[in-house]
């Protein structure tokens, strides 16, 4: 029997989501001075909350001020004022939705023109062929830096709860830092954080334990995990199953499944190797296997969070292209003791219902809600979206992919100004505008970071939130 899209979902923490539809994380790139949320994000999330989704997950909020995916990123660390975050949480929850903060560290996936640090499990850089120079070469993290970053995740989670958020989602997908440690292609360490999967998962598990130790039992803790990296010899569905098993006793409420990384952007429908999913014997490095011309844009070289839905090709999307991680998710749902959320390419109610029929508990959408923010309410009224993004037919796939994400951010900025989406926006205009805004944001971020004292190791661990 198919679970109804509009039935509630009770999580292990006791939290109840009003329905099975979630607004998945998309990096908004709208940080105000000081890398803080302002009235634009308040307006944007109030709009999404009124649109009928049971859960809103923010774009990835950075736990380390010196490590951002893009210059418009939000930072919530020990020094950030809470008032802007309180207003953000209150706006998202105003119509009854739960509001979770996605928290993340980019690791090696930092643009080369960004100040700060570029860290990874090893010194292996992002490989995108002729686009590789867009990213800096990472430094392999020390034991102290790993321990410090665990504490940073816990600090951000504790402060998110203090600000009024209902939960956090730890970003361990799309090739960001925790995902890098999980990947045998990126993590070549030979110490306690490398080698067997149990070691490669240690960082993530320590982060979850640290968060659970400082938040209240009723505060939701979720993990975003790749169902596969879609690179031969990389993290695969068998690994995902094992990690879910390791997470189960740690108090995790939900696992969101996606896939891919900057090198293989399956999260935007463009995996480097679609067959590289659950074959543990697959070898042959992913180096150079990614279609760099399709990768650079989805990689967020202008600040994307890793697209959570197909971008720039929405007009030609079919049922075959929708929910493109569903087969992997359905297999994992058969054995998972944790509720799963599936994100990637879902735009129609029929597809969402097909996802739920596979025993997945929650349906996540990103781009679809940037174009049609009230899509859940429309589905409740048996209506569908009436608009899709203008298709991009440029021969330069790299430029087309970057422009696709720019189109999505253009929609979010319009919503944040209380305007209606403009899905017909010309991609060239969206791209030019986006790059101009990112350039301004980079100058502002550089000035802000230069004024801050350099972050020290061994920051004081947060204490548990008391209610």
Provide a role label for each language-model segment.
Residues 1-467:
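Flavin-dependent oxidoreductase catalytic cores
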């Amino acid at each position: 029997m198919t679970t109804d899209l509009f039935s509630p979902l009770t999580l292990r923490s006791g939290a109840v989501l009003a329905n099975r539809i979630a607004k998945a994380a998309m990096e908004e790139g709208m940080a105000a001075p000081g890398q803080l949320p302002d009235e634009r994000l308040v307006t944007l999330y109030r709009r999404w909350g009124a649109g009928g989704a049971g859960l809103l997950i923010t774009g990835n909020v950075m736990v380390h001020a010196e490590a951002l995916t893009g210059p418009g990123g939000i930072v919530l660390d020990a020094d950030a004022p809470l008032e802007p975050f309180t207003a953000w949480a209150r706006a998202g929850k105003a119509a009854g939705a739960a509001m979770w903060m996605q928290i993340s560290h980019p690791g090696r996936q930092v643009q080369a023109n960004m100040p700060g640090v570029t860290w990874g499990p090893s010194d292996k850089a992002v490989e995108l062929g002729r686009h590789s120079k867009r990213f800096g070469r990472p430094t392999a993290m020390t034991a102290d830096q790993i321990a410090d970053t665990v504490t940073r995740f816990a600090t951000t989670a504790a402060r998110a709860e203090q600000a009024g958020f209902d939960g956090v989602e730890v970003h361990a997908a799309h090739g960001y830092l925790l995902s890098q440690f999980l990947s045998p292609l990126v993590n070549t360490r030979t110490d306690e954080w490398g080698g067997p999967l149990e070691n490669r998962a240690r960082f993530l598990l320590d982060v979850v334990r640290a968060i659970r130790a400082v938040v209240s039992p009723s505060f939701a803790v979720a993990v975003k995990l790749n169902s596969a990296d879609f690179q031969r010899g990389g993290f695969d569905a068998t690994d995902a199953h094992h990690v879910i098993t390791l997470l189960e006793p740690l108090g995790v409420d939900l696992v969101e499944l996606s896939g891919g990384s900057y090198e293989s952007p399956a999260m935007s429908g463009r995996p480097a190797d679609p067959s590289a999913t659950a074959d543990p014997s697959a070898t042959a490095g992913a180096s150079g296997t990614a279609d760099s011309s399709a990768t650079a844009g989805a990689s967020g070289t202008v600040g994307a969070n890793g697209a959570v839905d197909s971008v720039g090709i929405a007009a030609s999307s079919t049922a075959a292209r929708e929910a493109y991680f569903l087969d992997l998710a359905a297999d994992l749902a058969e054995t998972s003791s944790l509720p799963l959320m599936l994100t990637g390419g879902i735009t129609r109610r029929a597809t969402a219902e097909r996802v739920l029929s596979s025993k997945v508990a929650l349906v996540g959408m990103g781009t679809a809600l940037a174009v049609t923010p009230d899509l859940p309410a429309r589905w409740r009224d048996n209506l569908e979206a009436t608009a899709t993004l203008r298709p991009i037919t440029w021969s330069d796939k790299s430029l087309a992919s970057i422009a696709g994400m720019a189109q999505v951010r253009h929609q979010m900025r319009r919503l944040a100004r209380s305007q209606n989406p403009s899905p017909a926006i010309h991609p060239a205009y969206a791209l030019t505008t986006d790059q101009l805004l990112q350039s301004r944001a980079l100058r502002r971020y550089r000035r802000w970071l230069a004024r801050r004292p350099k972050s020290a190791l061994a920051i004081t661990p947060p204490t548990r939130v008391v209610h």
